[in-house]
Amino acid sequence: KPQQKIMKKIILITGGERSGKSSYAERLAHELSASPVYMATAKIWDEEFRRRVERHQQNRGPEWTNIEEEKELSRHDITGRVAVIDCVTLWCTNYFVEQPEVSLALEALKQEFDRFTAQDATFIFVTNEIGMGGVSPNEVQRRFADLQGWMNQYIASKADQVVLMV
């Protein structure tokens, strides 16, 4: 029996911290696939965080394929799969730390996003909506907010569906 071809789909889930974005993304992925992929973009910076990541992986269950990738999402072939990418904010951070020039970091992120989403898969991106809290007095934070906001806009412009969690 021929395998049914997945139609490429991009979904962006945005909202504030602790708004239920990740839980919603995971539920959605589970509805769409019996064996979804979870791509974590977080950099593991200490043992406590490592334990937290392991706890999250165990809570998701054995049907999930867990991938840790800080920057180069396109290195992973997820053709035909449903993937949660959690999260865009940390992914942007990983680029910004290495390239604090916002325009260059943004261009690198857009290129990587386009390479990654060229695959025939369902992509569920989770991001923080950081633009609703006012302007930071800190110049580095303002630059990062610009990067994050512009990347969110870019993903939203490519998305088939955008969900705001409140």
Protein language model annotation of sequence segments:
Residues 1-6:
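Short, Lys/Arg-enriched N-terminal segments with co-localized hydrophobic residues
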Residues 8-77:
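Conserved P-loop
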Residues 12, 82-84, 124-126:
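Structural motif
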Residues 25, 56, 84, 128, ...:
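Residue-level signal for inorganic ion chemistry
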Residues 32, 77-81, 118-120:
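Glycine-rich phosphate-binding loop signature in dinucleotide/nucleotide-binding domains
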Residues 36, 83, 161-164:
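Short, well-ordered beta-strand core segments
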Residues 62-108:
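Helix-adjacent hinge/juxtasegments
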